[in-house]
Amino acid sequence: MSEEKREVKIHGIYKHFKNKYYIVEDVAYHSETQEEYVVYRRLYGDNSLWIRDKKQFLSETNHVKYPDVQQKWRFELVDEV
């Protein structure tokens, strides 16, 4: 696992390792555990809103499960779609 420090960019556009694009709307907190969650929106299809825990959002792609994927991170910040 990388020691690289990554942060979520609000309103940043991210590419998922399965080649779909999302925009981060905000970071929210679980009311009981205070765990951080990333709130993000699909930039395709129904443009639905999703949440994922911040640690998982910023994690590396599982290259054992997805050996053909070249992207290092599950979600990578991009300049444009």
Identify the residue ranges that each predicted region occupies.
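Mixed-charge, low-complexity intrinsically disordered regions
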Residues: M1-V81
